[in-house]
Amino acid sequence: MSIDEIKTPQDILDFMNENIKYGWLDINNEEHIGNMKDFRKLYRTSSVQEVLSHGIGVCIEQVYLMHLLLYKINIPNKMFCTRIYEDENFNDLDADEHMHCFVLYYTDGMVHQIEHPNFERIGIYDFATEEEAIQKINDIYIEMSGGYARPVTEFFDVPNNYTFKDFNKYINDLDKKSLKR
């Protein structure tokens, strides 16, 4: 399936399944597929064009791509990030990453999630409300991280060439802005 053939959220999931693997480009433009070794040291966010040409992305890029594809077919949606909070002084480059990005879309008076980056949950999930969706999705990642509390933050863009630390700071800064409202 090509991007031009996408007409529905199921088409987006099918496109992702056919064309995008879990992986990332590093600061040296080397591909890492299916592993997170040296992620904190070498990761950088990829552009949508890089994701499409290399056929790889972690949750950050995959969610951004699905977000753009949903907008392309005129379906309102939002991107969110759940993570164990790390302040900007966190410098353990060997620590595990505890972040997951997800996209929710809104049709027929319901809220839906397209999950592709988490290979254990690939699919489309339905929820009655945005609050229910965020809570249930976040609960999955709280359990996966051993019960640690995880803030959830809506985000609006994926800047190119951000390191993991840069992206985490971007999300933290969005939290600070929302607290000031």
Regions inferred by a protein language model and the residue ranges of each:
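Secondary-structure boundary elements
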Residues: 1-54
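Non-Sec secretion/translocation targeting segments of pathogen effectors
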Residues: 179-181
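Extracytoplasmic/periplasmic, Sec-exported soluble proteins
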Residues: 4, 8, 51-62, 95, ...
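Hydrophobic/aromatic-rich core segments of domains that either
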Residues: 61-141
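Active-site nucleophilic cysteine motif
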Residues: 12, 16, 55-70
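Charge-rich, solvent-exposed alpha-helical interaction surfaces
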Residues: 15, 133-136, 140, 166, ...
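C-terminal helix-cap and adjacent tail motif
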Residues: 124-132, 141-151, 156-163
